[in-house]
Amino acid sequence: MKNLAPGLLLAMPQLGDPNFYRSVVLMLEHSESGSMGLVINRGAPLTLGELARGQNLGIAAGRKEHSVYLGGPVEPQRGFVLHDDTEQREKHSVLPGLFLSVTLDALGPLLTNPNPRLRFCLGYAGWGPRQLESEIAAGSWLFTEATAEAVLGHEPSKLWDTTLRGMGVDPAMLVMGRGMN
């Protein structure tokens, strides 16, 4: 079994689940017992300013209008912060230059500091044992390597197209039901 974490999964047109239409998923865990990732390019109808206000947290002025992202349909009330703040104490390394924090104690300093790049996701995408491998074999997902720049540095609304083009795939050549034409 190829380890897909960390890596990026790109949803192909034939994946029928609307939760994942043109989604880019950062894989955080992939093992015999299942897989977990965060959709990093699907905005939620919520800003970081609204989130901070709801949690009674301070926030840097430049962050207030930043989008919150729908990380996936599982546990949508649970928050995950992807960031590049090397000074953050409560963090897990995802890949070089990219960290994951999951506590409110970690969120406060990340919101008030205007410097680290971050992406806040609500919920996550999860797969049972061998489920993701079956979906990949059916042509529902395309895998590529992940970088901190791909996760934090690209415009989320263009990430699916940008990543495909970076792989040498023309999105216009993708055909429903067959993956790449």
UniProtKB/Swiss-Prot annotation:
Any Gene Ontology CC annotation: cytosol
Pfam families associated with the record: DUF179 (PF02622)
Source species, domain of life: Bacteria
Matching InterPro entries: AlgH-like
Record-linked HAMAP family: UPF0301 (MF_00758)
UniProt similarity note: Belongs to the UPF0301 (AlgH) family.
Protein known as: UPF0301 protein MXAN_2022
Organism of provenance: Myxococcus xanthus (strain DK1622)
